[in-house]
Amino acid sequence: MAATDLERVSSAEPEPRSLSLGGHVGFDSLPDQLVSKSVTQGFSFNILCVGETGIGKSTLMNTLFNTTFETEEASHHEACVRLRPQTYDLQESNVHLKLTIVDAVGFGDQINKDESYRPIVDYIDAQFENYLQEELKIRRSLFDYHDTRIHVCLYFITPTGHSLKSLDLVTMKKLDSKVNIIPIIAKADTISKSELHKFKIKIMGELVSNGVQIYQFPTDDEAVAEINAVMNAHLPFAVVGSTEEVKVGNKLVRARQYPWGVVQVENENHCDFVKLREMLIRVNMEDLREQTHSRHYELYRRCKLEEMGFQDSDGDSQPFSLQETYEAKRKEFLSELQRKEEEMRQMFVNKVKETELELKEKERELHEKFEHLKRVHQEEKRKVEEKRRELEEETNAFNRRKAAVEALQSQALHATSQQPLRKDKDKKKASGWSSIYSVTIP
């Protein structure tokens, strides 16, 4: 026999032998121990409600759990989709349930609905990431950890009676690999029974043709296989929610009162509310929790670990150790870092060269501009000098003319001042002669 065959035989696990017990041992109480531990620890269940504002999400939650949850009134004017989680502690008999209801506020209210699903996907991934980080801790405490992973998404469909909106198809397609989707037709009392039946068939046909995987109630457990198979044929559930009590006959029932009659919430002839409650809470709640952990979370965890460099070993190869994975990832990181550093260095060198060329070009342009301005300045200076010389010549000529004029004016003034003096002398001479003549003549 070859060495490889010997290794294969030695590595094969032996078949366990079945033995009969000679008396009572006591490990048949393990289920009771598990139940007792689970009851002591309590349970958590997280519901995501996706649907347009005013479609009845809060009312249906109140009706499902037969209580009134305090919620804020949603507005139709939300700028974007916002996830609003609220956690409640519920007690039924001796079972404690930590219920978290996450409402997609503002879904479908925007004009541009292309990215309406993005905040929902990011929220679901964020809860997976939180759980993964808790698992990867050296000192982890999953027993006390508040698990916020979404266990079921109730997708509320507007009762148009025609077909699914493109927003519904795109959103459910983005969510089906991350969460258990149960589609429900809200406000089913607004359309007739015949239209409702056609609408259900139309919805399921569109989901199948577009490859949308919704949650199917499990049929592998014999205890619930029959009822789950029947309920799978009723999807999507057409529901009516109400917390008001109306008197019908001699008893009060939760119903909606209309002028034409009463729609009873828990009457299966009126709507599928009872079917939804049975499938969601009383029959398949634990399966929803298990599917979230074993299917959706494991898919997210596997993708994240593969991104970190971890991978499963083949049957014929040696298993990878954590140290080997770390070293391989470290080498990959260092080589990538070195490559990035070289790229950045080369980029820096190229940038420096480009900057030097730009600076030289700027320097040349500035030098040319300086020379041009220098020539312009010299030309302006020459013109100013010419203007100054012309102005000086004009000033000198003006001064010469002014001096000549002033000389002429002084001469004329002198001449005019001499003329009255002669006249006075002539008058005096004339008066003297006349007096002489007057004396001599008797």
Curated annotation (Swiss-Prot):
The scientific name of the source species is Otolemur garnettii (Small-eared galago)
Localization, UniProt:
Cytoplasm; Cytoplasm, Cytoskeleton; Synapse; Cell projection, Axon
- G4 motif: annotated segments: 186-189
What's in the keyword line of the UniProt record? Acetylation, Cell projection, Coiled coil, Cytoplasm, Cytoplasmic vesicle, Cytoskeleton, GTP-binding, Membrane, Nucleotide-binding, Phosphoprotein, Synapse
Bias kind Basic and acidic residues: ranges = 1-16, 377-391
- Where would one find coiled-coil regions in this protein? 322-410
Q: What is this protein called?
A: Septin-8
Domain Septin-type G positions: 41-307
Q: Which residue ranges does the record annotate as region G3 motif?
A: 103-106
Bias type Polar residues, positions: 408-420, 432-442
Top-rank taxon: Eukaryota
Which portions of the sequence form the region G1 motif?
Answer: 51-58
> What subunit structure does UniProt give?
Septins polymerize into heterooligomeric protein complexes that form filaments, and can associate with cellular membranes, actin filaments and microtubules. GTPase activity is required for filament formation. Interacts with CDK14, SEPTIN4, SEPTIN5 and SEPTIN7. Interacts with VAMP2; the interaction inhibits interaction of VAMP2 with SYP. Interacts with STX1A.
A Gene Ontology MF term for this entry? GTP binding
Where on the chain is N-acetylalanine found, per UniProt? 2
Q: Which residues bind GTP?
A: 51-58, 106, 187-195, 241, 256
Instruction: List the GO terms this entry assigns under cellular component, sorted alphabetically.
Output: axon; cytoskeleton; presynapse; synaptic vesicle membrane
Q: What is its main location?
A: cytoplasm
**What GO biological process term is on the record, naming one?**
regulation of SNARE complex assembly
Which residues carry the post-translational modification Phosphoserine, per the record?
10
| Keyword set includes Coiled coil | yes
**In which family does this protein belong, per the annotation?**
Belongs to the TRAFAC class TrmE-Era-EngA-EngB-Septin-like GTPase superfamily. Septin GTPase family.
Instruction: Give one Pfam hit by family name.
Output: Septin
Please explain the role this protein plays, according to its UniProt record.
Filament-forming cytoskeletal GTPase. May play a role in platelet secretion. Seems to participate in the process of SNARE complex formation in synaptic vesicles.
Question: Region Disordered: start and end of each range?
Answer: 1-23, 377-442
